[in-house]
Amino acid sequence: MNIDMANSDDKALISEDTAHQISADPWYQVGFVLTTGVNSAYVLGYSGSVMVPLGWIGGTCGLILAAAISLYANALLARLHEIGGKRHIRYRDLAGHIYGRKMYSLTWALQYVNLFMINTGFIILAGQALKATYVLFRDDGVLKLPYCIALSGFVCALFAFGIPYLSALRIWLGFSTFFSLIYITIAFVLSLRDGITTPAKDYTIPGSHSARIFTTIGAVANLVFAYNTGMLPEIQATIRPPVVKNMEKALWFQFTVGSLPLYAVTFMGYWAYGSSTSSYLLNSVKGPVWVKAMANLSAFLQTVIALHIFASPMYEFLDTKYGSGHGGPFAIHNVMFRVGVRGGYLTVNTLVAAMLPFLGDFMSLTGALSTFPLTFVLANHMYLMVKRHKLSTLQISWHWLNVAGFSLLSIAAAVAALRLIMVDSRTYHLFADL
């Protein structure tokens, strides 16, 4: 089986039918899709969720190492996009082709959990941004976080009704980048100003020895979460041939230029506030009300766009399996179908987000339950299965080491994340106003 697309037929068959548009986007558009995920408003939490538990040395080394291993694992997965003369446009299609039907179902379950949790986190994040904006003008406790989360879910649903598939984002990716630059620049500048005026910062890693163990493991899961989508084959399905060469360009863009804003705001936030950094950086910064309001509203709007990327595999599944398959994407019956089906999906997302608004815990649990297995364990093992006759003993040992190591990390991170959720659940009630 040759998975090197440099010499393969660009007109390879597609693994299964799909109701969504594929093979239409240039590599740089896909690069911006990936960068939109990396620089989503989640970056405003990494100073608190990664740097505070790990400190300067652990956090810095962790971010760089996580980027390197994520680029490597995603490149492996990208090279598996075509096997047996077919382009496998879904992660589950690829796993099913290599392992069989049971693994198809397991991969789909893992991916569903991954994307559902990410989308839940996005809705929590959007709700936090809305509440932070309201509090700047009226801190009267009237507009509570669950109400903001409900409003965020409604806006996300409206956006989902109007964007039929991932490739249709196009100009919205430009808006997403613009919004990202606004809140990242404001957070960076205000943190820099606060850091200069604040005399001494405490960078001590908080918590008891046992608590630090769990928070460190959770931070490692957050590192993995920061760079990975868990849906690379679905994103790669939108790219023009040659699909591997173009996808590698998009990945290099994501992990070089595309990740610079993440590093800048994460390091600056931790430098300015130390171990007291909030899990939502804009809650820590001081500055003019209108500037902070603009940053929060930009974070809210960018989150609405970013959520659509991570919800697109579920939308594609629903549209392909249950949609009419007739008429254009904006035919009235197709629009009404999206309103009913996508609206229902996002309603469940929003309900879970409002019930358990513990953003950092969701990031950790998502990284543990699905990002580790999908991005690192499966990618390395699938590459072994496909290329085992062409790999040296050393290469085989390396991939098995990755499979075993990341499996253990996944289990440890899941335990740590569940512990954090249980602790927070005892501290806060359902539908808490955090």
From Swiss-Prot:
The keyword Cell membrane applies. InterPro entries: AA_transpt_TM (IPR013057). Keywords: Amino-acid transport, Cell membrane, Membrane, Transmembrane, Transmembrane helix, Transport. Coiled coil: none annotated. GO terms for biological process: amino acid transmembrane transport. The chain crosses the membrane at residues 26-46, 49-69, 106-126, 149-169, 171-191, 213-233, 251-271, 297-317, 339-359, 362-382, 403-423. It is found in: Cell membrane. GO terms for cellular component: membrane; plasma membrane. It is a multi-pass membrane protein. Pfam families: Aa_trans. One of its GO terms (molecular function) is amino acid transmembrane transporter activity. Signal peptide: none annotated. Proline transporter that mediates proline transport across the plasma membrane. PANTHER family: OS05G0424000 PROTEIN-RELATED. Belongs to the amino acid/polyamine transporter 2 family. Amino acid/auxin permease (AAAP) (TC 2.A.18.3) subfamily. This is Probable proline transporter 2.
